[in-house]
Each structure stands twice: as C-alpha cells, then as structure tokens.
C-alpha cells in the first residue's frame, strides 16, 4: 500500500514538499543481517541512463578501484539498462514496500544520480527515515533540498562524488547528525 498522501502538499522554504507516512514496523538491520553487508548506499528508481545510472556505475566502480572498503551499491527498481556484474553492485529488482523501507533504513545514504528530478518522493522518504542523501548537484531542485535541510550532499564530478561517499560511509557521527536534520526537515 502506497503511503503517499497528495492532500498534504506543503511548502518547505519555497520548495514543494509532501506528507510522508512511513510504516511503523521498519527493520533497518534486517537486510544487512540477511546479506552479511555492513555498509551500502541505495538507489531506488528506474535503472536507466536517463536517470544518471550509467554515470553512477562508472563513478562507483572507479571509487571501488581507488578505495579499500566494503561499501556496496544496492539497486531497487525496474532495470532498463545493463548493470555491471560485480559483487559490490546488488540489484534487487522490484521489491515489496516492506523490503524497500527496510533496505532504505539500513543504508548509509540514498544516492540520486539524476540531473532531471523535481519533487523526489524517494528522497523525502529517505530523509524521513533519517538516512542522508547524496544527489547530483546538476539537479537544482534536489541540490536545494540538500542545502536547505543540511541532511544531504551533492556532487558535480567524480572527485566530489568520492568525497561525499567517503563521508557517508566513514563518518557515523556525520550520518547520524544529517539523519536527524532530515527527519526534522520532512516533519516541517
């Protein structure tokens, strides 16, 4: 059951927002435990070049070649492009709402690589879950959500992507603080 209520459209500092209602039985560590994963970022949406996924794969693979860490990229959504076959990229396809929220809640961050988004419900859901976001800084709307909320970061090139990912994966204190700010932002 979709928990989005469009009658609750709100104004967040000039940017439209939506009332987000999350299930009460989210288990953020369930996916990690079942898969034996410690750190991961998550992408939720159509896996498509038009959504920035080709660049996401290129940046993530380069990052993994340069860094010695165990971070994984978990994908949820319809696949319309080839996904690199790697142990550190996990595609779940379409998932139940329960699994979606459990996976999102356990992530170090949600990644949104698209340059062309308006109001992203999945970004707001992530913030409501206390999970920071990393967005493509060429998408002005998502970038401004990060700036105003202080619950996310943005990148415009590989070096910024790598730095933001390092921060989210390696700095639990920063993740926790940004997570709290995200919840406050969505609750406004």
Language-model segment annotations:
Residues 77-101, 109:
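Nucleotide-activated donor-binding/catalytic signature segment of Leloir-type glycosyltransferases, i.e.
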Residues 34-51, 57-62:
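Conserved donor-binding/catalytic core segment of Leloir-type glycosyltransferases
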Residues 115:
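Aromatic "clamp/platform" in nucleotide-sugar-dependent glycosyltransferases that forms part
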Residues 132-136:
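Short hydrophobic beta-strand element within catalytic cores of glycosyltransferases
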Residues 1-26:
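Donor nucleotide-sugar binding/catalytic pocket of nucleotide-sugar-dependent glycosyltransferases
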Residues 174-188:
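A short, well-ordered alpha-helix in the C-terminal region of glycosyltransferases
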Residues 101, 119, 124-128, 142-144:
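Short alpha-helical segment that forms part of, or immediately flanks, the ligand-binding pocket
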